[in-house]
């Protein structure tokens, strides 16, 4: 199965942007918090529970407990004991514009991906990835396009080749429900952060005493 058939595309994920909701970031976070709390389709999500239960901002202890709760409640899959879980923040970040790193920066960042990792110490390698497009109607940014989609898959194919060159299969974990991806990452015992703030949030909510690795930052 090709990567395009494995990786979910969230072409209009304008509301459920976990980092912005938690860190009160951007021009929409207040409106989107209100939408999370008022729209029934978000009622069973981690962010709904977080916004209902939090007594302070940036409450990672609460978030961690909700991740554990939702994983058990919905029987979400979790990684194996000796599985390396890699977060790839893809989607609108590969686009053009002042607020996006762009194709060249992201592609360069993932060159030499395995240079500082020993693939032989892991039985399995899983990349958690979806193409996320924030589609901000207030700024006109972060919208889906076929060109940006193609550039994303070019980068993913490059990472796949590097992974196969070190003798590992590129397993993909990708969901149209961000909660499932977050819960999978937070249960990893070996976790590679991406350059995104979501990766940092997840790293503060790890369920286990995990080894955390960091990829190179984009320039």
Identify what each model region corresponds to.
Residues 124-215:
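Donor-binding and catalytic core of enzymes assembling or modifying cell-surface/extracellular glycoconjugates
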């Amino acid at each position: 199965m090709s990567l395009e058939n494995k990786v979910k595309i969230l072409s209009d994920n304008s509301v459920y942007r976990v980092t912005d909701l938690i860190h009160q970031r951007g021009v929409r976070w207040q409106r989107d918090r209100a939408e999370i709390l008022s729209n029934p389709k978000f009622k069973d999500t981690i962010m709904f529970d977080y916004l209902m239960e939090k007594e302070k901002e940036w409450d990672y202890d609460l978030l961690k407990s909700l991740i554990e709760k939702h994983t058990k409640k919905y029987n979400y899959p979790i990684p194996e004991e000796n599985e390396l879980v890699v977060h790839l923040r893809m989607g609108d970040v590969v686009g053009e514009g002042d607020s996006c790193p762009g194709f060249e920066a992201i592609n360069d960042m993932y060159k030499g991906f395995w240079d500082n990792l020993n693939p032989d110490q892991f039985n399995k390698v899983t990349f958690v990835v979806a193409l996320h497009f924030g589609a901000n109607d207030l700024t006109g940014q972060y919208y889906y396009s076929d060109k940006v989609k193609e550039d994303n898959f070019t980068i993913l194919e490059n990472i796949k080749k590097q992974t196969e060159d070190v003798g590992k299969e590129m397993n993909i974990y990708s969901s149209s429900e961000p909660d499932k991806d977050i819960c999978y990452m937070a249960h990893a015992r070996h976790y590679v952060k991406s350059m995104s703030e979501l990766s940092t949030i997840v790293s503060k909510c790890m369920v286990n005493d995990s080894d955390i690795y960091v990829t190179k930052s984009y320039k």
